[in-house]
C-alpha cells in the first residue's frame, strides 16, 4: 500500500485529537462515464454546509472494507457496484470533532442504479441529492469556495481524485 495522504484541519481551531474513525469512501463511475457525489446542504455541528462529497462512511464491526463499500454505495447512492481497485488512504483531522479519520478510497463502477437508498436520520437532513457529472465538472465544483467544513471536505475529495487519476494513468484506463 502506498503512503497515506495526510490533510490537516487548518480551518477550525486546533485541538487535541483523541478519537479515531475508520471509513471507506468511493470514486464511483456509472455507465455514462459520469461520477457520483452527494450534495450536502444544511446545518449541523460544523455550521452551514453547502458542498459535495463522495459516498462512504464508517466500517462496522466485523465488516471488511469491501463489505462496507458495497453497503455505503447502496445506502447512500442507491446503487450496486463492482469494486475495481483500492486507490489509497487519506487521513484527515476534524478539530471540531477531535477526530482523526482514516479513509480508505476505492474506485468502483456502477452495476445497477436507481435502487432505494437507506439513509440515517442525519443523512436525511443533510443529503439533498446525488449528482452525476463529468470529472472535469466535479473538479470545478470542488475548487469553488464554500463553507469551512465544505472546504475541508473538498480538499479531501480533490486528493482522492488525484489518487484515482494516478491509478487510471498507471493502469492505462481512460480518465473522463
Where are these regions (language model features)?
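Residues embedded in well-ordered beta-strands
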Residues: 25-27, 34-36, 105-106
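Hydrophobic (often cysteine-bearing) scaffold residues that line and stabilize catalytic clefts
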Residues: 20, 61, 65, 153, ...
Amino acid at each position: 500500500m502506498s503512503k497515506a495522504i495526510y490533510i490537516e484541519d487548518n480551518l477550525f481551531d486546533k485541538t487535541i485529537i483523541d478519537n479515531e474513525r475508520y471509513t471507506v469512501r468511493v470514486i464511483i463511475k456509472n455507465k455514462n462515464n459520469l461520477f457520483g457525489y452527494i450534495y450536502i446542504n444544511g446545518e449541523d455541528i460544523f455550521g452551514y454546509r453547502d458542498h459535495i462529497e463522495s459516498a462512504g462512511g464508517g466500517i462496522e464491526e466485523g465488516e471488511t472494507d469491501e463489505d462496507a463499500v458495497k453497503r455505503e454505495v447502496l445506502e447512500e447512492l442507491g446503487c450496486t457496484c463492482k469494486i475495481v481497485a483500492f486507490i489509497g488512504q487519506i487521513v484527515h483531522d476534524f478539530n471540531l470533532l477531535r477526530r482523526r479519520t482514516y479513509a480508505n478510497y476505492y474506485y468502483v463502477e456502477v452495476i445497477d442504479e436507481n435502487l432505494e437508498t437507506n439513509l440515517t436520520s442525519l443523512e436525511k437532513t443533510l443529503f439533498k441529492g446525488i449528482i452525476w457529472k463529468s470529472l472535469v465538472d466535479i473538479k470545478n465544483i470542488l475548487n469553488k469556495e464554500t463553507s469551512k467544513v465544505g472546504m475541508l471536505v473538498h480538499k479531501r475529495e480533490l486528493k482522492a481524485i488525484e489518487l484515482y487519476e494516478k491509478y487510471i494513468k498507471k493502469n492505462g484506463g481512460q480518465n473522463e
